[in-house]
């Protein structure tokens, strides 16, 4: 029988934990416990290391392993970014080491697999559960030679059940908003089975946890896939909402399933979206903005967030932070006086206060005074009571106080910003500079000396050397 590894429960005094974890003294005991449990469940932290003189070193190494997996700064310390990842809802399968008690990399020896829905969640109708499960299997059948057939009785290859807490497989669930589900790799008995926490709120949309998305991830494990370090992959361990109606299996997952089972039987092989690479020399941003000291770089359905104090950069789905925003944002800027961030796509724009959407949005850019001939904004930045909008090779200037366009605009970009002789993809303000991004380059324009003082690669902002 195939089972997830589970480790004995560790019980320690607060002082012992504080010594074992290289963290600030003021860190709450709750955070230490969370980190301890996380490393045990997902990174195979053994209990006896806490009882030895090398415990602090072992914990630091496990923290670094976890930080490496999630592309965080490998500090070996329980910093804010690390704690943030640990608190995200996720899959219950470990990221490190085998989660089976059998050696090797099991796979199904037949391609016509069967599945059975043992029970249902009361939050969705039986038909809704059936549809979500079918769609989740379809994601994998399109990319591989595998087929999936539901059976209503008898022994299936993959059994699907909604269960809670301790449910007899040595991998108990933890209640709402923690571990969402888990699954077992191919094999007899429990092998291939997928369990969903019945205490979670399962939905068909962006609220709470979308059953289709979680099921598709878990079925990847049922077929033999492990977790991916690619934050855009379906097999990434943390939950992130993506629009189900337009969902396409990412290329990383296609590569993974075809490595195990070979290509699809279809004459035309499927291709999927790839996660943008920070150090791609051809990388160009869709939009950039600051937000209360942080810098955001948007690309397709993702954004990089740069922390000025930590000097770290992390990649996230737009939908993870703002499920109401579209992918492919085209412009953004921060209004420092109003403490708002405005984001644009096509003729629509949204306003955020921190991470919260303001009421009454989206609105049409005609509110700024743009004519119907303007169908999209390339970039925007606000400075000294004025907001500059960049559209093709022109710049429009908006008076934030009067809430109208300044007369005499638009003007050509080079006439206003000598040295910026290109279309502007994105821009933000830092110190006495406008940072203009065009293709894979950025131009640092000093608005005091009124000239470009530096031209360099855009991805230097993502810590690429």
From Swiss-Prot:
GO terms for cellular component: extracellular matrix; extracellular space. Neutrophils. Expressed in uterus. Low levels in kidney and muscle. Ca(2+) 1 binds at residues 157, 189, 191, 193. It catalyses: Cleavage of interstitial collagens in the triple helical domain. Unlike EC 3.4.24.7, this enzyme cleaves type III collagen more slowly than type I. It is an enzyme of class 3 (hydrolase). SUPFAM superfamilies: Hemopexin-like domain, Metalloproteases ('zincins'), catalytic domain, PGBD-like. The keyword Acetylation does not apply. InterPro entries: Hemopexin-like_dom, Hemopexin-like_dom_sf, Hemopexin-like_repeat, Hemopexin_CS, M10A_MMP, MetalloPept_cat_dom_sf, Pept_M10_metallopeptidase, Pept_M10A. Hemopexin repeats lie at residues 276-325, 326-372, 374-420, 421-464. Zn(2+) 1 binds at residues 167, 169, 182, 195. Belongs to the peptidase M10A family. This is Neutrophil collagenase. It comes from Mus musculus.
């Amino acid at each position: 029988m195939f089972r997830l590894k589970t480790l004995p429960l560790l019980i320690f005094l607060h002082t012992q934990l504080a010594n074992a974890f290289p963290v600030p003294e003021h860190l709450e005991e709750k955070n230490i416990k969370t980190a301890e449990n996380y490393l045990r469940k997902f990174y195979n932290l053994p209990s006896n290391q806490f009882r030895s003189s090398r415990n602090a070193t072992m914990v630091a190494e496990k923290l670094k392993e976890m930080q490496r997996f999630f592309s965080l700064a490998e500090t070996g310390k329980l910093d804010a970014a690390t704690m943030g990842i640990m608190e995200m809802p996720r899959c219950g399968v470990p990221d490190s080491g085998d989660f089976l008690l059998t050696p090797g990399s099991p796979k199904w020896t037949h391609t016509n697999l069967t599945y059975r829905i043992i029970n249902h969640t009361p939050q969705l109708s039986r038909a809704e559960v059936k549809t979500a499960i079918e769609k989740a299997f379809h994601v994998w059948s399109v990319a591989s030679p595998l087929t999936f057939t539901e059976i209503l009785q008898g022994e299936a290859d993959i059994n699907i059940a909604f269960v809670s807490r301790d449910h007899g497989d040595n991998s108990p669930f933890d209640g709402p908003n923690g571990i969402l589900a888990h699954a077992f790799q191919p094999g007899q008995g429990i092998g291939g089975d997928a369990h969903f926490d019945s205490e979670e709120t399962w939905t068909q949309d962006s609220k709470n946890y979308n059953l289709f998305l979680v099921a598709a991830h878990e079925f990847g494990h049922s077929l033999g896939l492990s977790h991916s370090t690619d934050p855009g992959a379906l097999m990434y361990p943390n939950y992130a909402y993506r629009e189900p109606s337009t969902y396409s299996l990412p290329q990383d997952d296609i590569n993974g399933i075809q490595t195990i089972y070979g290509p699809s039987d279809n004459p035309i092989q499927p291709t999927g979206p790839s996660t943008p690479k920070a150090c791609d020399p051809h990388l160009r941003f869709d939009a950039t903005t600051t937000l209360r000291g942080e810098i955001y770089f948007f690309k397709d359905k993702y954004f990089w967030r740069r922390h000025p104090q930590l000097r770290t950069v992390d990649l996230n789905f737009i939908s993870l932070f703002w499920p109401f925003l579209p992918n492919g944002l085209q412009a953004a800027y921060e209004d420092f006086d109003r403490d708002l961030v405005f984001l644009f796509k096509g003729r629509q724009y949204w306003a955020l206060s921190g991470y919260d959407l303001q009421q009454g949005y989206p609105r049409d850019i005609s509110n700024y005074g743009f004519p119907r001939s303007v169908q999209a904004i390339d970039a925007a930045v606000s400075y000294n009571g004025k907001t500059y909008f960049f559209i093709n090779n022109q710049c429009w200037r908006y008076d934030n106080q009067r809430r109208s366009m300044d007369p005499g605009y638009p003007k050509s970009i080079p006439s206003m910003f000598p040295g910026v002789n290109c279309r502007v993809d994105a821009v933000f303000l830092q110190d006495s500079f406008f940072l203009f991004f065009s293709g894979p380059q950025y131009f640092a324009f000093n608005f005091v000396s009124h000239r470009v003082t530096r031209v360099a690669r855009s991805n230097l902002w993502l810590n690429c050397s």
